[in-house]
A protein has these predicted regions:
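Short glycine-centered segments of the SAM/dcSAM-binding site in methyltransferase folds
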Residues: 84, 142, 166, 232-233, ...
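Mid-domain Rossmann-like dinucleotide-binding core that forms the NAD(H)/NADP(H) cofactor-binding site
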Residues: 118-193
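NAD(P)H cofactor-binding loop motif with strongest signal on the N-terminal glycine-rich segment
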Residues: 148, 216, 239
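Glycine-rich beta-strand-centered segment in the early N-terminal region that forms part
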Residues: 21-38, 50-92
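Glycine-rich phosphate-binding loop and adjacent beta-alpha segment
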Residues: 171, 219-291, 324-325
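Short amphipathic alpha-helix with an adjacent loop that forms part of the alpha/beta core around
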Residues: 196-206
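NAD(P)H dinucleotide-binding glycine-rich loop of Rossmann-like/cofactor-binding domains
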Residues: 45, 78, 84-149
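C-terminal capping/lid region of NAD(P)-dependent oxidoreductase domains
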Residues: 4, 289-298, 306-325
């Protein structure tokens, strides 16, 4: 088969389309013939040499894909050759074939195109696990989403609205904010022109956000805590603004607030399987019912993954960038 390889870390040109051995599914795995993969910022970090695959994972980038089951490994039941699936991966999505543990497989939701389904697993699992399983967002609460026009952001808006929350977003410029509004965002904040703390407090009559989903890390840490409501929950899932910051813990104590930081890729298989099962139970019906949908910015050939990385790094996209095999 062919896959995108990274012989040496570097810029987008470091991604090389090359012939590699076919993966062989192990116990409890299936072999998926990839229809499409989605580009994530984690893939960019891996290409740059900053985010290596966990032990035992495929060396090729790609944390989510869609396709058809081509073969079953030993001990697999409940799935059949030919089933259309999408999958949460530890790596290997940028390839014509990938071996996937069955606990990380999902059926393609009703009404979703096979290729578009590649836009779902990583973002849905990230949002559901952080916003709902960890931060316990409830109906009537306010959710602040940083990077509202990103793949994560566009999914967080939809899921927040689906459960009855008020959703605030930050994004860069009126065009991206307009797309967020189309998805249901209630409070639109242009981070280039406005202070998100002031805007959130103004929109909530001084209460603040009950849950904040943050991709920036250190750069926003102190301001995020100021924007939190009493008993608020800050979920840090990215470090685009740096990994080291200072925080007055007294502010957390006063608000009885919580800060969590999680990643998905390196979690044990059992934890990933639990998240995937929760997503299938709670989110898949929302997608099948048309209340939540994948948001796809553009689709490129898998062999042109470098262009997909350029788009992500330029932050010109809204939603997901897909690579089709």
């Amino acid at each position: 088969m062919y896959a995108i390889t990274i012989p040496e870390p570097g810029g987008p040109e470091a991604l090389v389309w090359a012939e590699v051995p076919d993966p062989v599914p192990s116990e409890g795995e299936v072999l998926v013939e990839v229809a499409a993969a989605a580009v994530n910022r984690a893939d960019v970090l891996q290409r740059q040499g900053f985010y290596n695959p966990p032990p035992g994972a495929s060396p090729y980038p790609g944390l989510e894909c869609s396709g058809r089951i081509a073969a079953l490994g030993p001990g697999v039941s409940g799935w059949s050759v030919g089933d259309e699936v999408c999958a949460l991966l530890s790596g290997g999505g940028y390839a014509e074939k990938v071996a996937v543990p069955i606990g990380q497989l999902l059926p393609v939701p009703d009404g979703v195109d096979l290729a578009a389904a590649a836009a779902l697993p990583e973002v849905v699992c990230t949002v559901w696990s952080n916003v709902f399983m960890v931060s316990h967002l409830r109906p009537g609460e306010t959710l602040l989403v940083h990077g509202g026009a990103s793949g994560i952001g566009t999914m967080a808006i939809q899921l927040g609205k689906a459960i009855g929350a008020k959703v605030a977003v930050t994004a860069g410029g009126p065009d991206k904010l307009a797309r967020c509004a189309e998805l249901g965002a209630d409070i639109l904040i242009d981070y280039r022109e406005q202070d998100f703390v002031d805007e959130v407090l103004k929109a909530t009559d001084g209460v603040g956000a009950d849950v904040i989903l943050d991709i920036m890390g250190a750069k926003y840490l102190e301001r995020n805590v100021r924007a939190l409501a009493v008993n608020g929950r800050l979920a840090v899932i990215g470090l685009q603004g740096g990994a080291k910051g200072e925080l007055n813990l007294g502010a957390l104590l006063t608000k009885r607030a919580a800060v969590t930081a999680t990643s998905l890729r390196g979690r044990p298989a059992a934890e990933k399987a639990a998240i995937v099962a929760a997503v299938r139970e709670h989110v898949w019906p929302l997608i099948a019912g048309g209340r939540v949908r994948p948001v796809v910015d553009r689709t490129l050939p898998l062999s042109d993954a470098a262009e997909g990385h350029r788009v992500i790094e330029a932050s010109t996209h809204v939603g997901k960038v897909l690579l089709t095999a």
